[in-house]
Amino acid sequence: MERILVPIDGSKCARHAMEKAKAIAKAFGSTVVLLHVNDFYQHVTLYKMTEVEEMFMEQFDQLSKDILAEGKAFFAELGDRVETVQLEGNVANRIIEYVNSNSFDLVVIGSRGKTGSMDFLVGGVAHKVALHAETSVMLVR
């Protein structure tokens, strides 16, 4: 188990996923890649952004960086075996694209994120990733 992807969004379930991934990484000497997808970009017009949209975009970008920094701090004991990636767009689609275009042995993802989704048992993003990722996926509550 060389590489583990952990999509994070700052939610409680994402924290639980990080805890599981950390235990696995420590046991196998794995590299952990923390991924945060900023979905604000899919809600703004590409033609011309207003000042308010630009301000929100900057705030969401900083929030993404903060989430990744907190995640990296959580995995500090792994040293250089922790990487962070920030992407923009539809959360589920970008996670799936990233997983399927890179070499991962496992995806560890929280069963529900911050979207407030009321999907039965499993959130929409986690469900879509589990169905479409071309590697093993562990859903964590």
Which residues fall in each region the model found?
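Short, hinge-like loop/turn segments at secondary-structure boundaries
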Residues: 50-53, 101-103, 125-126
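Short hydrophobic/aromatic patches at helix-to-coil boundaries
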Residues: 137-141
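Structural beta-alpha unit
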Residues: 73-107
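Small/aliphatic-rich secondary-structure junction motif
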Residues: 2-51, 76, 83
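A short acidic, glycine-rich active-site loop
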Residues: 52-66
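Glycine-rich, Arg-bearing micro-motifs that act as flexible, cationic patches
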Residues: 106-131
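Short glycine/serine/threonine/alanine-rich loop segments
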Residues: 30-31, 80, 104, 135
